[in-house]
Curated annotation (Swiss-Prot):
Main localization, broad class: cytoplasm
Signal peptide coordinates: none
Domain of life: Bacteria
Catalysed reaction, written as an equation: Dipeptidase E catalyzes the hydrolysis of dipeptides Asp-|-Xaa. It does not act on peptides with N-terminal Glu, Asn or Gln, nor does it cleave isoaspartyl peptides
Organism annotation: Escherichia coli O6:H1 (strain CFT073 / ATCC 700928 / UPEC)
Location in or out of the cell: Cytoplasm
Designated name of the protein: Peptidase E
Function: Hydrolyzes dipeptides containing N-terminal aspartate residues. May play a role in allowing the cell to use peptide aspartate to spare carbon otherwise required for the synthesis of the aspartate family of amino acids.
Classification via NCBIfam families: PRK05282.1 (NF003642)
CDD domains: GAT1_Peptidase_E
GO cellular component, one term: cytoplasm
Length: 229
């Protein structure tokens, strides 16, 4: 399988998806036709989200079609060279994909060789479940099971920063809560600016920041770019 799982879409001082373009270009390998799944977008229309994505990827010669705009979305996915899943609200994303019967077709086409690109919520969707999202559950997706393209859980936008005077939990504390009730999980705290690529049977960590892996009953393990999972 070929996957590009990004923690986020924007970095300070850079345009939207600018940091991701070289990574996408490296994994295209001749693929030029993409379907875009915009369902995580809540405060922007799916048309606008698709147009925004298409404009950025045009520089790589990739044509983008919004899955919401086609007559037969399942067929569009089955014939896709690239499946792109944008960030936003993960619960809304999973709900829409489940209701439209898209989860199994996405899994199948990626296993057959399509490239999967997802950022933030799109990276969450590639995991076994969406239980490590940071998002508010604004809708009920009728279960948390997701695509299971990547075998570990990703927590995008990972940071342990706590504003002075703030009494809420840190991100690690919330992850530890999940590991109490689901100790079988391995959770990757993927900070902004980092990504995971899957290619030729290997999953490799990229990006300038330290990533952390959490397991029940163990200290967090710091990982740097180049680590293979």
């Amino acid at each position: 399988m070929e996957l590009l799982l990004l923690s986020n879409s924007t970095l300070p001082g850079k345009a939207w998806l600018e940091h991701a373009l070289p990574l996408i270009a490296e994994q295209l390998q001749g693929r030029r036709s993409a379907v875009f799944i915009p369902f995580a977008g809540v405060t922007q229309t799916w048309d606008d989200y698709t147009a925004k994505t298409a404009a950025v990827l045009a520089s790589l010669g990739v044509s983008v079609t919004g899955i919401h705009s086609v007559v037969d979305p399942v067929a569009a996915i089955e014939n896709a060279e690239i499946v792109i899943v944008g960030g936003g609200n993960t619960f809304q994303l999973l709900k829409q994909c489940r209701e439209r019967g898209l989860l199994a077709p996405i899994t199948d086409v990626v296993k057959r060789g399509a490239l999967y690109i997802g950022w933030s919520a799109g990276a969450n969707l590639a995991c076994p479940t969406i239980r490590t999202t940071n998002d508010m559950p604004i809708v009920d997706p009728q279960g948390f099971d997701a695509l299971n393209l990547f075998p570990l859980q990703i927590n995008p936008h990972f940071t342990n920063a706590l504003p002075e005077g703030h009494k809420g939990e840190t991100r690690e504390q919330r992850i530890r809560e999940l590991l109490v009730v689901a100790p079988e999980l391995t959770i990757i705290g993927l900070p902004e600016g980092n990504w995971i690529t899957v290619s030729k049977g290997h999953a490799t960590l990229g990006g300038p920041n330290t990533t952390y892996v959490f397991k029940a009953g163990e200290e967090a393990v710091p990982l740097e770019a180049g680590h293979r999972f």
